[in-house]
């Protein structure tokens, strides 16, 4: 490894640098690396002990300059001085310039006598800033003087002082190198000249060193070897220069023809032999020869290129630095190891030893190589080329080197281009002079490789004269018999160049061996001996390549050597990926039999087959698709840009007009015709085109020729010309589309899949074009997979239209934009980025087909074109108006829009609205209004109303409508048994996942999903598991053994039998599966059975997919089966030649299955289509099929906002239910498997398919009559048929249940199910594992204590019946849902007469087009919610109370309680209010959880408060009215007694004691109802400055409410959040003002007191009806025991007791105080509103419902509430005033109740404030204020009396009070942040809200009445 640090020297080119290096290093390197023959030469480059340079240490006194920079500068200065002194002639300069220019990687172009030139090469532009800076400095310092100045002259010129030091002998002995000298002298110069610039210091030091070396008296001593070498070098250079100037070059010596160069190479293992080396002139003895070292250069430390080096290198550098000279060093590596970083020790030590021996002669050398890698432009450890100045990292070479190569090495550039740099130097005069001086020539030691390029071994090698390659003569091909005479060029140098750039290698083959080489007879041979046998050549590989920019017509064969030389990377990659020993078979032509026949008939095809097709080139790639453009060259020849069929646009190529290509003339004619049509160009350049038969394109009329509103009765002539015929319904579609165009109505064509929407659209656009309505351009946006189909349809139906497909990568699209968008060259800016098209530019095409993605990606170009019409295929991509596609398309300039979709109502109305909004935003812009309009009406009305609105915009036909004669389709669900192997794996999967299954409440949805997927795999085939696949028996070719494969799966057993019969019947089959691995297994199965097949899955795209379809659909095709993956086999695939579809495993999403079987049931189908859906009996598959079917129903039948769009995901409960399905039976079987005589028992339920059953299954006539009548968009539901003969046992009892379609059963899940089923198996399995694994890991037992006490229930009763929905023996079970009446809602099972015995209705069902939840229809669900909002939580006896409103009276108690339980579970279910459904799939219907829970809480507080005082206050507010009412009733004996029932409470409830409220259904405990009586008492104690809070007798009269009262109360938002009521100061007024005050309430602004909960107001007539039917009942729920007792009490003064302990947080008590004072004084107890009225208001709310003010006022029991308003009855807005006052008053009471509850809880939790707390300090201040005010009350009176001193004191007191109050006010503002709040429930229970709700939503430990009811 050799070379210098830092950037190369400025005099690095040519001999100038060598001279400089000679002086610097005291050695003389040759001017050219090859001149080692010269005996006079001091050192041969190849034998130089390339010692590493010594690094210069940083000077402590000059820290500013980095070492590397300093070294570079020193070196550059010395270079200039020494170079200038050498007196080179102009020849050297010229030569140097030439070399510098020839090398594009030199570091500098500096030459003496000239200013430095900056190279223009691209690589130099990357020069770092530091380099540029240095070069600028160098330029500044560069002076043009030819003579180097002495140090004294330099210092004098600069005006600086010279040093006076006289060098002693000791100095000359010790300062043996420049480094030591510099360290000694530099401080002396710096001391004299402290401000000397670094560059000047370098120059002075250089001059001083030169003078010092010249004057050194010890030149011969070893101590001064370096100085001696330097002097010798100077002498030699001078002699060289003199010779150059004086002597002319010697004339060439005439030599006889010489042999070609040879050398003794060194193989990898060869020993090193000694060889003479003319190192020092006087030393003639030969020195041992060594392998020529490889130079490796370490990049400059100062540059950005980092040097990476190992520790070994660093050590070597350090050790070699001691002997290195000045600023250059060499690192050598000649070892066989190829690593430049870690060299072999042996070699290193050898080099060091040699260096030490020859230290007198050499101290290193400097090369003129670049110091950075040619490839990456970075520095570091680089490998130097021996034949040019380039350098490389080993990793940057291709292929990268692992180790440094041995000997001389040439870089890839030299190997490719030949040696130029070295050849130039060969002729340098310097070398010739040295050769002359040397005299004797020695054996040449050159740069040629030390080993054979072919076999990599040493020995005698033949060397090439123009490159470093060496060969054995026997390794050449053909071998040479002897060394040739004269100049010899190796195969690499004689290798012909390639004709272009290779794009890809297609195939390779063995070529013909070259002709053998004759061996000359030896001169001394016997003439009779036969001639020697000629040397045979070897066959070499030939590669068939495609050329860049050329078509496949130009593909040709090239030799391996050509590829290796010119395409190294591509060749290496090809070698890596392909077998290079055995050429690939050229069997690409497809069916051999067909191609053989065709070859016999068509000689042209035979030729093409021989030349191209057999090597993998498809015929389509050589067929012209269209000509895109033309160009004319200087000679007038025309070239055409051709786009080839089935190849992207970036493979388009230019071809000259006279190339022979099939149909070329036809396409040229077509190109010019189109050009003429679009631009009116007549003339065309080039040769005259041959006459070809081509239909002349007719120019479309300028004005419309046909009225588009007139219907076509038959298809027009221009369609007849295409050869196609439209179906009648397609003609109708065409007429409708044309009419809509004329009317300017944008439309949606929503025909069902398979009715030819693409054809209708193509014909519609063609008709616009042909009739002159529009010439386009038309934009079609479609899914990428269907674009090929669109191309075909346009080709077929619109032959005159120019259709461009704008798809592909950036390059393809750039070519399309340049050539296909316009005829004008500059219409669009070129390049890969899309840009706008010029406005005035004409458009070249009529139709542009593109994908959704490109609409947004290339919106710049597409958005700049004015489109006549937009067509969006599969338009449900526009269903979201927030999508980018929607927004971008909205910005396009579109005159007309047509959307195509097969499922316009796929999910919900919102999506339909977005489609309409896109079409006509001016009409459909209000989404909310649209949804509201269609939100709550039955389906039939909804569809009809929608139809009226959509009529002008949408056309939708179903196959059932338009093809009365189209073959029907029948879908049968075929239930299949698990094979024994599948059962084993099924049980194993369940057992292995026991812990995941058993984590009650905590089971992860993802883990359950994984279990389901594993079980689905098991149902398909056990070989889908790696373990089973490994153990499975295989055939020698690696395929599974067929019989074992079939036996392992129940489905394959059945499939085998079915396919056999289907094949015999001449049917063809599509088999769909979700899993591609299953398709692999099916391939093996079909191979085993010997059926031919095609396959499409997600990995097969575009053209390959279409080819497979075409092969299958081709007439007479042999393929019997087509394997498709369910999702990949979706859009745009037409397989109408098949008539049987087998869905091997159902997709999660039923839409995908429907799309799948629509592939066969479509236009073109002329046979009945049978669809067989395989479902494994009693497994997850069966359950998934049921759930998917029900979800599908829910999605389609309930066309309402929100529902259905997210039904794809399964809830945890659903997953758990799916997993449980059939497991009990599976494990039951296991128990009976022990006995051998269980066959008969098993047979009863196991499915058997014998020949008879298979025949019945495949019978195609079984359902024909029914299927033809299928109607409507729910056709897929009706097609779910059940093969009734499949199961031997049939449940006859379920036949009657046909009125209700069950969508989902109520979950009644046994939490211990998995525990009971799997615990034993799991523990057994763990024991087995432990036994097998030794001690193993401890298994933690999974015990769940949460739900342990829950009763066991058989979940199968309600949920997953062992027999699926499909085992019903009626095929009509799923049909005609819409025709059912709503009356027989619940199933009536035989023998079940009693309501109690009736089973609960299913959780979700559909009746008459409406969804029912547990038997509750939409109206009943709404009524239930209204009742909740009106009365709060239903009490235990709600079923017998006023709670049961009219709509709910038809429900049994069991159903009612079940629904209450479900409703409360939903309320407590965690999840967003925005979700469309609850976790169990029940529609949410806009339920707001917060509002409902708040209302329930408030009503509960009111009920509890009324119950507390009810037994004291009685049930009549004015007892005297009770008798009047009774008398009225007596006079109307026929009328029913009014019911006044309320929730039951024990009659002996004590005062101030909350009556117990029964626990809420479903285990939900509302906290308000479970508090203790101490709480209320505690809370009451906290009330301050209010009237007495014990029972108040009715004799007290309340004070009137004043006009200016203002109450601001926030509604209760939650338990913790209670706002303090703001109270405005009140003033007392006389009692007469009360009615006025009440009347003027409406004038008071009350912005805060707004009820956030919705108030549900029901029909008043309904209410009256209810009231007539009510029974007499107390508020506590009891009927009055003794009415006489009541009568006796009426004359006695009635006791009254009521209080709300709000702690003074509201103004309620101050109001009460004032009101009661007024009432007492005026004796108007009834007329002035006070505490008594408030109680009866709350009692009325409990009885009549929340905010039912009118009902309460009309009830005689609450007549007291009307008394205060009697004076206002004459006012017009009397009712409004009264209701407003009641609402405000109730708000205040509601707030007080909430605060009381909070205080009660605080007391219950023993919450108290710290005495030092700010609130307590506030309390103290308040006491001070109170004390101050009370103690100085007398001052007020005295001051009023005129006492002046008292007046002064009063002022002081008032000031004190004011200060105290302002302090308190400041404290109050800070108070809310500091008051301790009741911690939220979540904190107290240390559970998250989600966990609490989950626990509430689960069933309670003890059985609730609902559960009991369900079990009954």
Curated annotation (Swiss-Prot):
ATP binds at residues 751-758. GO terms for cellular component: centrosome; cerebellar granule cell to Purkinje cell synapse; chromatin; chromosome, telomeric region; cytoplasm; membrane; nucleoplasm; nucleus. Its main location: nucleus. Gene3D superfamilies: 2.40.50.40, Homeodomain-like, P-loop containing nucleotide triphosphate hydrolases, Tandem AAA-ATPase domain, Zinc/RING finger domain, C3HC4 (zinc finger). Its cofactor is Zn(2+). It comes from the Eukaryota. SUPFAM superfamilies: Chromo domain-like, FYVE/PHD zinc finger, P-loop containing nucleoside triphosphate hydrolases. It catalyses: ATP + H2O = ADP + phosphate + H(+). Residues 494-594, 622-697 form the Chromo domain. The keyword Repeat applies. It is found in: Nucleus; Cytoplasm, Cytoskeleton, Microtubule organizing center, Centrosome. Residues 1577-1912 are annotated as: Required for interaction with PCNT. Residues 1570-1584, 1603-1644 have a biased composition (Basic and acidic residues). Residues 1-157, 243-360, 510-537, 578-603, 1344-1401, 1525-1562, 1570-1589, 1594-1644 are annotated as: Disordered. GO terms for molecular function: ATP binding; ATP hydrolysis activity; ATP-dependent chromatin remodeler activity; chromatin binding; DNA binding; helicase activity; histone binding; histone deacetylase binding. Residues 1054-1203 form the Helicase C-terminal domain. Keywords: Acetylation, ATP-binding, Chromatin regulator, Cytoplasm, Cytoskeleton, Disease variant, DNA-binding, Hydrolase, Intellectual disability, Isopeptide bond, Metal-binding, Nucleotide-binding, Nucleus, Phosphoprotein, Repeat, Transcription, Transcription regulation, Ubl conjugation, Zinc, Zinc-finger. Residues 113-131, 340-353 have a biased composition (Basic residues). Belongs to the SNF2/RAD54 helicase family. It is linked to Sifrim-Hitz-Weiss syndrome: An autosomal dominant syndrome characterized by intellectual disability, variable congenital defects affecting cardiac, skeletal, and urogenital systems. Short stature, macrocephaly, hearing impairment, and facial dysmorphism are present in some patients. ATP-dependent chromatin-remodeling factor that binds and distorts nucleosomal DNA. Acts as a component of the histone deacetylase NuRD complex which participates in the remodeling of chromatin. Localizes to acetylated damaged chromatin in a ZMYND8-dependent manner, to promote transcriptional repression and double-strand break repair by homologous recombination. Involved in neurogenesis. This is Chromodomain-helicase-DNA-binding protein 4. The lineage of its organism: Eukaryota, Metazoa, Chordata, Craniata, Vertebrata. The gene is CHD4.
